[in-house]
Amino acid sequence: MNIKKFIVVVFLILSIKSYSQSWSPMSANNSIEKSYYIKKHNNSVGNTKVWVKLISNRIPYIDNNGVKKYTSGSELTLYNIDCNNSKIEIIKSILYDSSKKVIKTTEYNNWIDVAPETISEAILIKGCEIL
């Protein structure tokens, strides 16, 4: 195989891999007000990390002065998921306005038990499916 064909094959494989890692809807009933999407970040033994994207016209947040505000835009949250023990850890959250400007970045370090019929349970289930 000559070098040109090899480069084309490598490029095609990398393109397919990056396409397969696109955002997947969390549920079929995403609404106009709120839509959740999930994307695999990486795996470690027994755990997986996923990004969850929330798109909404009204995302609440606390500004630097402690005042509750709302923005139209998106929020990306990185989760560490322990599928064996039904726990999730929130690692980081990044809030963007509608023009993709970062409004707030927050880092966390806390594991939570997942309550039934919550967005946390949906993240756990979907995250463990893509493990």
For the regions a protein language model found, what residue spans apply to each?
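N-terminal secretory-pathway/extracellular module detecting exported/lumenal segments
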Residues: 19-75, 82-131
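N-terminal secretory signal peptides that target proteins for export/translocation
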Residues: 1-3
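Sec-dependent N-terminal signal peptides
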Residues: 5-14
